């Protein structure tokens, strides 16, 4: 069933809004994957805050105009599934990477992060990016480390003095 002009405009507006708010995107060829597996992929994506869209490439190219994913338009060919990360940089890549381990028919074509388009070989690396909470945790640990070391150093001096005095006392009592 062909889409009417109004339906096409609605699809373009919807994808454009998602793309404008997304942190990263993954385009993967889904040819040969059954409906049940695609439904499972959509469920996994929803749980991770990833939006999946299957749209015609011409509509996707129009939707990407003026967004950071505009550079993907030139390389989009074939039936593509678009996954958009809405919560952190690597969530879409994680969902697609994990799903493609078990389903070889899902073949990654493009990965876009921050307006830069990467090939499929970068999917695993992008999927290993920390989540927002993990990044904050790493940052806080890094900021906390110098203070912790300073406190440990400051506590070491009085502790050493107490041990020295105790050793002198034990030596005098033994003599």
Swiss-Prot record:
GO biological process, one term: translation
Keywords: Ribonucleoprotein, Ribosomal protein, RNA-binding, rRNA-binding
Annotated GO CC locations: ribonucleoprotein complex; ribosome
Entry keyword Oxidoreductase: no
Molecular function in Gene Ontology: large ribosomal subunit rRNA binding
InterPro entries: Ribosomal_uL10 (IPR001790), Ribosomal_uL10-like_sf (IPR043141), Ribosomal_uL10_bac (IPR022973), Ribosomal_uL10_bac_type (IPR047865)
Pfam families registered for this protein in UniProt: Ribosomal_L10 (PF00466)
Gene3D superfamilies tied to this protein: 3.30.70.1730, 6.10.250.2350
Function: Forms part of the ribosomal stalk, playing a central role in the interaction of the ribosome with GTP-bound translation factors.
Membership in a protein family: Belongs to the universal ribosomal protein uL10 family.
Subunit structure: Part of the ribosomal stalk of the 50S ribosomal subunit. The N-terminus interacts with L11 and the large rRNA to form the base of the stalk. The C-terminus forms an elongated spine to which L12 dimers bind in a sequential fashion forming a multimeric L10(L12)X complex.
Protein name as annotated: Large ribosomal subunit protein uL10
Organism whose genome encodes this protein: Psychrobacter arcticus (strain DSM 17307 / VKM B-2377 / 273-4)
């Amino acid at each position: 069933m062909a889409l009417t002009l109004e339906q096409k405009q609605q699809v373009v507006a919807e994808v454009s809004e998602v793309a404008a708010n997304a942190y990263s995107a993954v385009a993967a060829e889904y040819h040969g994957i059954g409906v049940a597996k695609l439904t499972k992929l959509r469920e996994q994506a929803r749980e991770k805050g990833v939006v999946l869209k299957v749209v015609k490439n011409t509509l996707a190219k129009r939707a990407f105009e003026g967004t950071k994913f505009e550079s993907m338009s030139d390389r989009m060919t074939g039936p593509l599934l678009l996954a958009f990360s809405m919560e952190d940089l690597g969530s879409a890549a994680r969902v697609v990477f994990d799903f493609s381990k078990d389903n070889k028919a899902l073949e990654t074509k493009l990965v876009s992060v921050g307006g830069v388009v990467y090939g499929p070989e970068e999917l695993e690396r992008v999927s290993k990016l920390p989540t927002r909470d993990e990044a904050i945790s790493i940052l806080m640990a890094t900021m906390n480390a110098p203070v912790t070391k300073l406190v440990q150093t400051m506590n070491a001096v009085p502790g050493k003095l107490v041990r020295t005095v105790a050793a002198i006392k034990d030596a005098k009592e033994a003599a």
